[in-house]
């Protein structure tokens, strides 16, 4: 499955700019800013979250990489995203070890902003 995935430069993750609105927090992190490793981006697997593929199909193939309660780092997920994306994070459900567990969580592809080029 990984061999068929699109390649994406690692710095594309950093090209997404942060946004805040309403009760949702929208940023370019897979999960919490309270990640135990500074700069690490990850997502906590949970039965109630979904990742939308770039064509908005469901579920995203990256879900196959996620066992429940596992962590997925950016290098695992990056090949599945061909462009910048935004993560919309709901309220934290609970605290586990050094990271927060969020649900629901949706990764929604968005075009790169001209000012970021």
Regions found by a protein language model. Name each.
Residues 40, 48, 56-117:
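Catalytic core of Fe(II)/2-oxoglutarate
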């Amino acid at each position: 499955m990984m061999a068929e995935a699109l390649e994406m430069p690692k710095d594309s993750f950093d090209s997404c700019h942060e946004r805040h609105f309403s009760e949702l927090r929208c940023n370019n992190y897979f999960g919490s800013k309270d990640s135990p490793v500074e700069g690490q981006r990850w997502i906590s697997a949970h039965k109630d979250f979904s990742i939308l593929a770039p064509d908005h199909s469901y579920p995203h193939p990256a879900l196959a990489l996620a066992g429940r309660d596992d962590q997925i780092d950016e290098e695992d997920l990056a090949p599945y995203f061909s462009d910048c994306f935004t993560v919309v994070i709901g309220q934290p459900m609970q605290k586990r070890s050094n990271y927060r567990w969020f649900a629901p969580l949706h990764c929604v592809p968005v075009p790169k902003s001209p000012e970021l080029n």
